[in-house]
From Swiss-Prot:
Annotated residues for binding of [8Fe-7S] cluster: 26, 51
The organism's taxonomic lineage, starting at the top: Archaea, Methanobacteriati, Methanobacteriota, Methanomada group, Methanococci
Species, as recorded: Methanothermococcus thermolithotrophicus (Methanococcus thermolithotrophicus)
Name listed for the protein in its UniProt record: Nitrogenase molybdenum-iron protein beta chain
Reaction it catalyzes: N2 + 8 reduced [2Fe-2S]-[ferredoxin] + 16 ATP + 16 H2O = H2 + 8 oxidized [2Fe-2S]-[ferredoxin] + 2 NH4(+) + 16 ADP + 16 phosphate + 6 H(+)
Positions of transmembrane segments: none
Encoding gene per record: nifK
Function noted in UniProt: This molybdenum-iron protein is part of the nitrogenase complex that catalyzes the key enzymatic reactions in nitrogen fixation.
């Protein structure tokens, strides 16, 4: 670690040896990944649309084809 002084702001600069991939530590993504691997199934997310959109985007980038994921589309007004 090294201390860097930028005018009046002083911060510590850290050097990391690795990176954390959120896709590898996210349990819902793991469950959806397992469901996509079973023929004739569609993953269902009982949550917000944003969570499903992120997973769709990640899967589309990985598989390079559209992936269907169903969602309940919950939002704060439904509570």
């Amino acid at each position: 670690m090294s201390e860097v002084n930028a005018g009046e702001i002083c911060y510590v600069k850290k050097q990391r040896k690795g990176t954390i991939n959120p896709n590898k530590i996210c349990q819902p993504i793991g469950a959806m990944w397992a469901t996509v691997g079973v023929k004739g199934t569609i993953p269902f997310v009982q949550g917000s649309q944003g969570c499903t959109t992120y997973v769709r985007y990640a899967f589309n980038r990985h598989f390079r084809e559209p992936v269907s994921i169903a969602t309940a589309s919950f939002h704060e007004h439904a509570a």
